Structures are given as C-alpha cells and as structure tokens.
Amino acid sequence: MQVDKIDHIVLTVHDIEATCEFYSRVFSMQVITFGNGRKALLFGEQKINLHEVGKELEPKALNSAPGSGDICFITDIPLQRVIDHMSSCGVEILEGPARKTGARGPIESIYVRDPDGNLIEISNYLVNAA
C-alpha cells in the first residue's frame, strides 16, 4: 500500500477559540465547522482538526496533549516578510532563519510557538541549493 498525501492532522488544545483566532490571524487559515460543531483550520488541500483537552473524540492519539505538536508549514513568501509579519502579529521568533531539510530538499526555516506551545516551523524551499 502506498500513501499519497496527508488529509488532516489533529491538535489537542486548551482553548479552541483562541487557537482558531491565532491560526486565522497569523497564518490566514480558514476556520471551518463540521460534523457536530467541530472546528478545523483549513489551508491548501489539508486541515488541522482541533480537539479540546479532556474532551477529545475517540479514537484519539495515545498521548494527546496541548503543546506536543511539531509542524512544518511551507510558504512561497520570502522568510524576511514572514519574520516581519510574525513581528507585527506579536509572535516571537524562537530560531532562524536556519537551513534544514524538508521532504523535497533543502529549506530555510524559522520557528515560532502557537498559544499551546506547539512548535511551528515556517519554511521556504531553497532553489538551486547545493
């Protein structure tokens, strides 16, 4: 069996509304409601489903906890503009720019945290990198 792509991931969070506000304001993600009032963050062809800690739907991750996520987002926006945007949103840059390796090759990344402490890497693929 071969997997083609990721459809969604799940983040367990303390406050779904605060998480929705952060990701929509900082990353321009669309907040959607589905199912029985569930919330998700839609971007590109994938989404992040949100579970409130202590109220997770079954089945759930074995050790779901706020702040346990580590996600890399790819953007075509130059990292300096991303850094400026993070600053204007009041989001601290933890590290970077730093060269890393993405799924398709070399990337340059910065790192921030969301309101629950999840590590968010924001990256550009490097063109013609050696």
Task: Name each region found by the language model.
Residues 18-19, 78:
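Short phosphate-engaging motifs
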Residues 119-122:
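Short glycine-/small-residue motifs
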Residues 19-24, 86, 117:
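Conserved active-site tyrosine of GNAT-family acetyltransferases
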Residues 1-6, 30-77, 81-113, 125-130:
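Vicinal oxygen chelate
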